[in-house]
């Protein structure tokens, strides 16, 4: 069986190389009469409140055009509908149903779970023990989702054998362009999501509308997002508490890794009523973080009212003693002396649809609220 699959894979790659991207695997049966792209005009667009890195335009016949800023355009074609004639060469065709997805961008999983669309994911770029989302971990344990290799080293045989009809990547794929090219030669379209480039924290959550479009459940996606925003309106409308907050972790080299003032975490602190301690920290690089020598971190953050340790990258801390093992200089910080030091939970990075809860947690620690209500932060003892 493995030899047969490998032979089919080799043949598919050869055909893809001879015929161009997307021709190795035929799309689902098409029954509608062909339409001309030049004759198609948008009828309406998805309303966006915070997101700036994508748009969705609707066309007659159930077609939707997703435009990802500074990246690509994707035409979502309804099941059994024909691909329009004369389609622009840069538009990637995504034929519904998209029900055998290779999900590489781990931050997207939480949005599929929220949409009750886990069954559309067949393959994962994250191993079972790498998931902090219980539903994803259980689906892999049950054999419903198969590990198919990380973004830079996918298992093409497994992916092809699963009749994969979409790969969802993040911009890391551009570090290995040959992988994207190979997937496309197999007839597997690659959707590159850029939610991490959203300037507004809630814009990241709003990408659920993209996946609602891909999966044919836009109304559900829009309601989920609206409910999330409505749930923190009370916090967003409160006056700022005026407390300063640092958000950091200590690297293996002993430096303090902090967020730039333009990063979404810094913005969430502001939305929660706080003031990010490094509110003027910017540079021209695309990175959202900066490594500071401890002396510089001491000078900038020692008087912060609240300290939050980022455990999504480093190990999770439980006590102040564990924090001071990272650097004895931290003992002189105001928040350490007053016992106002907190740590994030490890599952924070993958919990894309819980950013509203993180804003609420930030507000709780900034406004001296009830710590028993916290979901993604805990106090260091």
Language model segments and positions:
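A short, structured surface patch at a secondary-structure boundary
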Residues: 64-68, 74-160, 166-172
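Flexible, glycine-rich surface segments
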Residues: 231, 235-318
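Extracytoplasmic ligand-binding site segments that recognize negatively charged/polar headgroups
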Residues: 99, 106-113, 124-135, 175-178, ...
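Bacterial Sec-exported substrate-binding components of ABC uptake systems
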Residues: 21-109, 220-248, 370-381
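Bacterial N-terminal signal peptides that target proteins for export
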Residues: 1-8
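C-terminal motif of bacterial Sec signal peptides marking the signal peptidase cleavage site
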Residues: 16-20
């Amino acid at each position: 069986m493995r030899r047969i699959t490998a032979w089919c894979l080799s043949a598919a790659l050869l055909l893809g190389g001879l015929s161009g991207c997307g021709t190795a695997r035929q799309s689902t049966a098409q029954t509608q009469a062909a339409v001309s792209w030049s004759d198609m005009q948008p009828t309406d667009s998805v309303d966006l409140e915070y997101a700036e890195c994508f748009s969705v335009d609707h066309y007659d016949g159930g077609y939707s055009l997703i435009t990802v800023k500074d990246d690509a355009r994707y035409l979502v074609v309804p099941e059994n509908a024909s691909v329009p004639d004369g389609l622009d060469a840069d538009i990637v065709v995504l034929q519904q149903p998209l029900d055998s997805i290779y999900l590489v961008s781990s931050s997207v999983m939480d949005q599929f779970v929220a949409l009750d669309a886990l069954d559309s994911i067949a393959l994962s770029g994250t191993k079972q023990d790498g998931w902090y989302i219980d539903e994803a971990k259980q689906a892999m344990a049950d054999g419903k989702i198969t590990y198919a290799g990380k973004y830079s080293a996918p298992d093409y045989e497994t992916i092809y054998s699963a009749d994969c009809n979409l790969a969802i990547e993040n911009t890391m794929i551009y570090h290995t362009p040959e992988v994207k090219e190979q997937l496309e030669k197999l007839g597997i379209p690659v959707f590159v999501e850029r939610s991490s480039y959203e300037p507004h924290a809630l814009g990241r959550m709003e990408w659920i509308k993209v996946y609602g479009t891909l999966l044919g459940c836009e109304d559900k996606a829009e309601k989920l997002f609206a409910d999330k925003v409505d749930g923190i309106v009370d916090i967003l409308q409160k006056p700022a508490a005026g407390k300063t907050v640092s958000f950091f972790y200590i690297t293996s080299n002993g430096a303090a890794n902090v967020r730039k003032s333009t990063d979404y975490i810094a913005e969430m602190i502001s939305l929660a009523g706080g003031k990010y301690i490094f509110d003027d920290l910017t540079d021209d690089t695309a990175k959202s973080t900066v490594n500071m020598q401890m002396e510089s971190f001491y000078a900038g953050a020692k008087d912060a009212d609240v300290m939050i340790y980022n455990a999504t990258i480093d190990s999770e801390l439980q006590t102040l003693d564990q924090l001071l093992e990272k650097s004895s200089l931290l003992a002189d910080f105001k928040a350490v002396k007053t016992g106002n030091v907190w740590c994030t939970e490890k599952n924070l990075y993958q919990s894309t649809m819980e950013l509203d809860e993180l804003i609420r947690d930030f507000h709780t620690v900034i406004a001296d609220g009830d710590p028993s209500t916290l979901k993604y932060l805990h106090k260091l003892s």
